[in-house]
Structure formats: structure tokens, C-alpha cells
Amino acid sequence: MGEKGIRVEFAGAGRPPRMFRPGEFPRPLSPREAETLRFMLSPQDPRLDSLREQAEVAHVRGVCHCGCATIDLAVDRDRASQASALSSPVIETRTPQFDPANGPFELILHLADGWLKELEIVYYANDPPPEFP
């Protein structure tokens, strides 16, 4: 834990470290977080089967310090299998049209060594979105 209980993790090649707000963790995914994760894993590609399995036993380890909906994930590795032949980010999506009130946003699903790692929202508005759209 860093200053004021904020956890910092190195994000990997080319990405700055992400800082997570302190809180009651681990915790289950909220209904909206679980729905968003299912949406991100909905393409009918058999390579995603192990990630869908992981999503069923994933929990939240932290949330982004900026107040956005980004969540740091952990998976019960005894109850799911590791994905292979996939790199991170594994899934990305963007808003199809510009929303003047909220601006555009992107959702990105990251892996670490074949395990679900982070469900990230990238936003371009002034205020961070506190939940996934």
C-alpha cells in the first residue's frame, strides 16, 4: 500500500502505473460490473471460453483512484482455467456515436498471463463515469 492506503500497480509495457482507491476488497462484482464483463466476453469465439469461465469466479480487488468505473480483477484460479493464445488487451469496444453529454468512451478488457486482470473504461469527458455505461 502506498500513501493514504492507495495501491499502485505497474500496468505493463507502455502504460503508466494505475493507482487504486482504498476500500473493502476483495468484493463481488456489482450487477452492472458483471453485466459489462459478460458483454465484453459475448463474442462467440471459442478462445474466450476460458475467460467466460474465469468471469464466473472473478472478484474485484480494487477500483481506480480517479473515481471512474475501472475495476481491478482477480480470479479464483482453483475454479477456472488459464486462457492461452490470447494477448492483452483481449477485447476493446468504443461508443459508436459521440454523446455530447458524456463524450466518447472505450471499454478495454486486460489480461495478465492468461487471467482476467482489469476492466477499464477510458473516458474523454471532464468527469469520470462512476459506473459502466
Task: Show where each model-derived region lies.
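N-terminal domain-onset segments
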Residues: 2-94, 130-133
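Short, compact, well-ordered microdomains
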Residues: 98-133
